[in-house]
Amino acid sequence: MISNFILFALFIVTIALITKPLGSYIFRVFNNERTYLDWLAKPFQRVYLLVLGESSKKEQTAKAYFFSLVSFSVMAFIFVLVILLLQGILPLNPQEIKGMSFPQALNTAVSFITNTNWQSYSGETGVSYFAQMLALAVQNFVSAAVGLCVAIALIRSVARHETATIGNFWNDLGKGVFWILLPISIVIAIVYIFQGVPQNVMAYLHVHTLAGTEQIIPQGPIASQEAIKSLGTNGGGFFNANSAHPYENPTVITNYIQMVSIFAIAAALTYTFGKWVGNTKQGWLIFGVMLVLFIISLVVMTISELHGLDFLHSKDIQDIYGQVGHLSNMEGKESRFGVFYSTLYNTVSTSASDGGVNSVLDSYSPLAGMMAMLNMAIGEVIFGGVGAGFYGFFMFLMLAVFIGSLMIGRAPSFLGKRIEANDMKWTMFALLISLCCVLVFTGLAAVIPSVHQTLTNSGAHGFSEILYAYISGANNNGSAFAGLSANTNYLNITIALSMLIGRFGVIFAVIMLAGSLVKKKRSLQMSEISSLDTTSFIFAILVFFTILLIGGLTIFPALGLGPILDQLNLNFL
């Protein structure tokens, strides 16, 4: 127990120590100030902007910014789709893996351009090295950079006033990749290689075991993909077992680096925001609320797994319980990680839009599985994905400002800018579109017989598997309850739709809100005298409960039919 507490404290301290320097660095990068990586990144940026021409030089309005973002994503989608369909005839395919079917290729392409990395295929048998490196790994970089661009555009809109532009998407995209994601990923990949993660393009090895049987040992460019998988909060594993596989996550050190990587940029953006708007206290308040939500989620999930079998009344289990005095749920977990390393990793990955796992979520107790769902359903605002976590949290922040101001009889304003009805429309659109998508698609899937045939469990747990799939897809997480066999035409297409709606529906609302905020006048005197204090402890509590009430209660009826009912069923075994 003491070692678990030390690990947790070390993790939190590491994230806190990273936040300010990395946040300041991100601020300098996007504010066109000198950085210590200019010598490395500028040559790449010059070539990139030279190819783009004039489109990368002019500042863009919100509509133009969104149009550029969607145009880029469409091109990326077509690029990935074609490679996946044709991978059987492309080079670097020593295992002679065939091209995907169209529904599966469509699902996978959508998954990677939306930073979801939902996988209805097994990585070691479904994708060639060429497709892994040129299609999927590239999207791990640029899809994360797209989310970062949206967050930066939103931050600019708060900091600027009485103007019409929020930056240039193409310029921001290059900065996100060349100054931030690529350099850090190179360092992480080198560390992974030294820790034993393979990085090659060899054919799979066929070895004879001591038992006289043949075993196939997969190979591949794993370290490079694993680095950006976590840093870019992508989560798509090179192997079907994801970070439970010893080639993806061989040591406690790689496990720790992956967890820190997932939260690093998301945490840093809170300081970037505070520094950019001239109020670092505001940034630290956001960090604090995120941290409290994370701790609560981790505690509930860990206790559920450490004591997940204590309530079972089976005689056989009671006999074991009587012998050991305590029975934790180790099903689906790596013995080298144990319960706490597993719950910590999976709380991190479901709080962010990462989706990587080092244990099987479908084997978790219903209450622990519910916490994973809730982390995603509230919009993954507990630090969250690269960029996506910040702009998702900002929507709740705006709602809390609006509610709090009206409660005390003041005109809603945030950092000197009036919050008007149109702003709240975009805010609520961003907050509700993913949840509506989840409820509609889950309801449809629950009454379709062909979907029932893909389940390995029935009843409440079977419903939980369906619900988890659409929560994960719509919130661009990508993790799954493994009991759902997702490679069917219906699930491939509907989960792809949920990923598209959850990604670009929210981004559209966020950018439109940014376009509204950037045009407003900014009066700091008005903010100080007649508005809600948005850096106070009381406001932090208001934001906390706004997230729980709006995000949590909306999905609560569905959770009641799934994991809550599943937990109650277990209690009466």
Swiss-Prot record:
It comes from the Bacteria. The chain crosses the membrane at residues 6-26, 66-86, 135-155, 177-197, 257-277, 283-303, 382-402, 428-448, 493-513, 537-557. GO terms for cellular component: plasma membrane. Its main location: membrane. Keywords: Cell inner membrane, Cell membrane, Ion transport, Membrane, Potassium, Potassium transport, Transmembrane, Transmembrane helix, Transport. InterPro entries: KdpA (IPR004623). It is found in: Cell inner membrane. The keyword Protein biosynthesis does not apply. GO terms for molecular function: P-type potassium transmembrane transporter activity; potassium ion binding. It is a multi-pass membrane protein. The keyword Transmembrane helix applies. The system is composed of three essential subunits: KdpA, KdpB and KdpC. PANTHER family: POTASSIUM-TRANSPORTING ATPASE A CHAIN, POTASSIUM-TRANSPORTING ATPASE POTASSIUM-BINDING SUBUNIT. Belongs to the KdpA family. Part of the high-affinity ATP-driven potassium transport (or Kdp) system, which catalyzes the hydrolysis of ATP coupled with the electrogenic transport of potassium into the cytoplasm. This subunit binds the periplasmic potassium ions and delivers the ions to the membrane domain of KdpB through an intramembrane tunnel. HAMAP family: KdpA. This is Potassium-transporting ATPase potassium-binding subunit. The gene is kdpA.
